[in-house]
């Protein structure tokens, strides 16, 4: 009988040893890395899910970091704005002091003007030197770029002020803005028709209290005072009441200088002689203005006087137009702004694109004018027009 010698037992033992060693290596690798899946052979489907999850976690961490850095940039800008606000309030105080010409000497006004100029230079310096990680943020380089584009590219000449806080420009890097004004803002107005006078003059003595947006005054007129006399007296203190008067062919018209529902005119006849007809021909005792009504890219805007604004997920802007204007406006936002990536996916709905306006005194302005006009030798310095200077500073303080 013949015998066949084999090494099957050894082969089986080697196979078992290799398997055991492989499992040991896998176990040691899992223990050392803390990961169940270290390669595709461990769990192909699980590896794909694991890598996707790791990608999402990494992206989310970066998004959180981006949000923190965006907050740091805003905090830097806010700190600079606080300094500018303090300087503007100092300028406002200097303007008020310089207006007290009854006791303030020319030398004191000159000293105040020098201090105003110094404060304006400080504001310009802040605008040019405020940086975040080497990038200047208040010089206008992060503002949106606006051009007379849109459907017709018209109406921008009627815009007194345009502020774009946020815009989603999408992949085209531009957005057309179309604005239609259905109802322009109006002033508050009252009138006394010609029947309230005889030959354009009062029939009897008259005392009235006139109240407007800015204050109240009491007027006393004698019999025979003309419509022009009444208008002149009212206009003499129009800055205190906010109401202006005109003689329109014998009709005394009273209207606020301000527009919108916050503007009002109120006339109370305190006393009038028996022969007087002023009160009987007054069109009313109180009237208020109306706010502008506008549609921006199909969205109804919120109106306030001659200003209106919208705040949507794709566009956040505020516009101020010429008083009473109803001209359609079309323009294009074609780039600019600071982009903040706030989500894990690089898509527009997970980004914020914010416009940061320039704080330069030659740029920042309101309907009354630009801040640089307060410098010595310009039209709104402390010598030429302290009242106008105060109005400009008030508007700029509101914007800042």
Model-predicted segments: where are they?
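Primary detection of the long, small/polar-rich alpha-helical "axial" segments characteristic
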Residues: 1-400
């Amino acid at each position: 009988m013949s015998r066949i010698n084999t090494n099957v037992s050894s082969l089986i033992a080697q196979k078992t040893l290799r398997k055991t060693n492989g499992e040991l290596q896998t176990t040691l690798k899992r223990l050392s890395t803390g990961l169940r899946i270290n390669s595709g052979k461990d769990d192909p489907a699980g590896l794909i899910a694991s890598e996707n999850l790791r990608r999402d976690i990494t992206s989310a961490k970066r998004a959180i970091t981006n949000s923190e850095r965006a907050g740091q940039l805003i905090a830097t800008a806010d700190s600079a704005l606080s300094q500018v606000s303090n300087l503007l309030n100092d300028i406002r105080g200097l303007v008020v002091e310089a207006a007290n010409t009854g006791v303030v000497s020319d030398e004191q006004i000159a000293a105040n003007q020098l201090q105003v100029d110094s404060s304006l230079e400080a504001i310009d310096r802040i605008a040019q030197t405020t940086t975040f990680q080497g990038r200047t943020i208040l010089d206008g380089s992060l503002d949106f770029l606006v051009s007379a584009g849109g459907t017709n590219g018209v109406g921008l000449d009627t815009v007194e002020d345009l502020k774009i806080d946020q815009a989603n420009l999408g992949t085209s890097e531009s957005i057309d803005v179309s604005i239609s004004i259905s109802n322009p803002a109006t002033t508050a107005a009252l009138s006394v028709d010609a029947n309230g006078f005889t030959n354009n003059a009062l029939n009897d003595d008259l005392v009235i209290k006139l109240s407007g947006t800015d204050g109240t005054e009491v007027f006393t007129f004698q019999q025979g005072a003309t419509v022009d006399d009444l208008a002149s007296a009212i206009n003499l203190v129009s800055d205190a009441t906010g109401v202006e008067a005109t003689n329109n062919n014998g009709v005394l018209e009273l209207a606020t200088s301000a527009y919108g529902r916050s503007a009002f005119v109120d006339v109370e006849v305190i006393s009038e002689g028996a022969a007087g007809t002023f009160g009987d021909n007054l069109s009313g005792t109180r009237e208020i203005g109306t706010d502008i009504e506008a549609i921006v890219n199909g969205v109804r805007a919120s109106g306030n006087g001659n200003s209106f604004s919208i705040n949507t997920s794709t566009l956040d802007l505020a516009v101020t137009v010429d008083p009473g204007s109803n001209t359609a406006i079309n323009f294009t936002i074609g780039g600019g702004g600071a982009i903040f990536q706030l989500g894990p996916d690089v898509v527009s709905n997970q980004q914020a694109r914010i416009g940061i306006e320039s704080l330069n005194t030659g740029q920042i302005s309101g309907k009354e004018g630009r801040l640089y006009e307060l410098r010595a030798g310009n039209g709104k310095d402390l010598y030429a027009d302290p009242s106008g200077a105060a109005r400009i500073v008030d508007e700029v303080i509101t914007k800042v």
